[in-house]
């Protein structure tokens, strides 16, 4: 039988989260607002699968270009190629220093 190469394959360390008692995902992460042109860091929250980008983009920084429903369109360069990702705010953090 051929092994599966699913969306979360080869991401055992990257896609794990330490469970701490009395702590869950704060609602403020879901309610974050971003403006067009904001620089954001992509930090995947492994406990929320919806709106999650591919693990290769974890730790990258991009620019908000548009909003699509609850998610944001983030443009970044992957090598020399420009890419657009549709990511929910649970997996984004605003860059504080410019």
UniProtKB/Swiss-Prot annotation:
Cysteine disulfide partners in this protein: none
Q: Which GO terms describe its biological process?
A: translation
| GO molecular function terms attached to this record | structural constituent of ribosome
Start and end residues of each stretch annotated as Disordered:
1-28
* PROSITE patterns, alphabetized: RIBOSOMAL_L21E
Gene3D superfamilies, per the entry: Ribosomal protein L21
- Give residue spans, biased composition: Basic residues: 1-17
A single cellular component GO annotation: ribonucleoprotein complex
**Matching InterPro entries, A to Z?**
Ribosomal_eL21, Ribosomal_eL21_arc, Ribosomal_eL21_CS, Ribosomal_eL21_sf, Translation_prot_SH3-like_sf
Record keywords = Ribonucleoprotein, Ribosomal protein
**Pfam families, from UniProt?**
Ribosomal_L21e
Can you tell me which family this protein belongs to? Belongs to the eukaryotic ribosomal protein eL21 family.
NCBIfam families reported in the protein's UniProt record: PRK04306.1 (NF003303)
User: What is the name listed in the Swiss-Prot or TrEMBL entry for this protein?
Assistant: Large ribosomal subunit protein eL21
Tell me the name of the encoding gene: rpl21e
């Amino acid at each position: 039988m051929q092994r599966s190469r699913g969306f979360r394959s080869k991401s055992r360390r990257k896609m794990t989260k330490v469970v701490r008692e009395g702590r869950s995902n704060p609602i403020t992460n879901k309610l974050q607002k971003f403006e067009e042109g904001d620089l954001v860091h992509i930090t995947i929250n492994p406990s929320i699968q919806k709106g999650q980008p591919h693990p290769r983009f974890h730790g990258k920084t991009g620019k908000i270009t548009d909003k699509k429903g609850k998610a944001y369109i983030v443009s970044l360069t992957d090598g020399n190629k420009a890419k657009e990702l549709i990511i929910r705010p649970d997996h984004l953090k605003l860059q504080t220093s410019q």
